[in-house]
From Swiss-Prot:
Species of origin: Thermoplasma acidophilum (strain ATCC 25905 / DSM 1728 / JCM 9062 / NBRC 15155 / AMRC-C165)
Protein name, per record: Nucleoside kinase
pH dependence: Optimum pH is 6.6. Significant activity is observed over the pH range of 6.4 to 7.8. Enzymatic activity decreases markedly at pH 8.0 and at pH 6.2 and below.
Catalytic activity line of the entry: adenosine + ATP = AMP + ADP + H(+); cytidine + ATP = CMP + ADP + H(+); guanosine + ATP = GMP + ADP + H(+); inosine + ATP = IMP + ADP + H(+)
Cofactors that this protein relies on: Mg(2+); Co(2+)
Record InterPro entries: Myo_inos_IolC-like_sf, NucKin, PfkB_dom, Ribokinase-like
Family: Belongs to the carbohydrate kinase PfkB family.
Its job: Nucleoside kinase with broad substrate specificity. Catalyzes the phosphorylation of a variety of nucleosides to the corresponding nucleoside 5'-mono-phosphate in the presence of phosphate donors and divalent cations. Displays the most efficient activity with guanosine, followed by inosine, cytidine, and adenosine. Negligible enzymatic activity is detected with thymidine, uridine, and 2-deoxyadenosine. ATP is the most efficient phosphate donor, but can also use GTP and ITP.
PANTHER family recorded: RIBOKINASE, SUGAR KINASE
Annotated catalytic residues: 227
UniProt-listed Enzyme Commission number(s): 2.7.1.20, 2.7.1.213, 2.7.1.73
């Protein structure tokens, strides 16, 4: 049995800097910068640096993603389970920002044609962004991690409730968790649940208790921080450590990704363990 299947986006974000966001008409573009990311892509780049074994499941259009695939393959990331559509583009997100507000235009492209299938048996299967994965989740025996991210509205009330109940763990950010509770009517989670809340840190709901993990002050771009946090969680699970230890790993890794950027992330296992001990002494009584 393999360790982890990770479902999500290999997204190209095109960042467009403008002086102001117009209601209509046109404005001058000050800067145009593509960035390789997505829920699965960001996770994969960080997880690979810690040699966490995983299989990436996603779909891309080869009109746009050849360079992206070449980059992650050069890092040793296996793309054998990434479905490649030769005559398709995407997924691409165009993000225009004036520094205060932003507007996004999402082209799903290949993801809309993808019919995902699991190719092997895994201990963990992580379902993040993409199509509605509920039918697949109901048919497998793996430990399911439900992580709908910004696509939580893709699921109905009953689907959200069912996916959560059959999962080993659910992961939301603070906004998604509010949406989840409002849609399902659940006042508290039924299974182990992680809620991330940016600079306020994260919370673990487990066995009827809540454990809070403060964030480490950071300054930088937060894009990819949440996906990097998940790499820390799986690093702990792969090494048969506790979920609480994974929360600390994730907090520290996300801090470094925010400060340094994913492309410059260089934290090694020795330094991570040292920083984990420092974090435990400062913030927690249990890990």
């Amino acid at each position: 049995m393999r360790f982890l299947a990770y479902f999500g986006h290999l997204n190209i974000d095109v960042l467009i800097s403008v002086d102001s966001i117009p209601r209509e008409g046109s404005v001058n573009v000050k800067d145009l910068r593509p960035r390789f990311g997505g829920t699965a892509g960001n996770f994969a780049i960080v997880a690979q640096k810690f040699r966490i074994p995983f299989d990436l499941y996603s779909a891309v259009g080869m009109k746009t993603h050849r360079e992206y695939l070449a980059m992650i393959e050069s890092m040793g990331i296996n793309t054998g389970h990434v479905e490649k559509f030769e005559d398709e583009s995407g997924p691409i997100c165009y993000i225009a920002t004036d520094g205060k507000k932003q507007v996004s235009f999402m082209h799903q492209g290949a993801m809309e044609k993808w019919k995902p299938q699991l190719a092997d048996e895994y201990e963990y299967v992580h379902f993040s962004t993409g199509p509605n994965y509920l039918d697949m989740a109901k048919s497998i025996r793996s430990k399911i991690i439900f992580d709908p991210s910004q696509e939580i509205h893709k699921y109905s009330k009953d689907e959200l409730k069912k996916f959560h109940e059959i999962s080993y763990m659910s992961i939301f950010n603070d906004h998604e968790y509010r949406v989840f509770r409002e849609m399902t009517g659940l006042s508290s989670p039924k299974v182990t649940t992680i809620v991330t809340n940016g600079e306020r840190g994260s919370s673990l709901f487990m066995d009827g208790k809540k454990y809070d993990f403060p964030a480490i002050p950071s300054s930088g771009d937060t894009v990819g921080a949440g996906d990097s946090f998940r790499a820390g969680l799986y690093l702990a699970l792969y090494n048969r450590r506790s979920i609480e230890k994974g929360m600390i790993y994730g907090t520290i890794i996300a801090h470094h990704v925010i400060d340094d950027g994913i492309e410059n992330f260089s934290l090694n296992m020795e330094d991570l363990e040292r920083e984990t001990e420092n974090y435990r002494r400062m913030f927690t009584k249990r890990s």
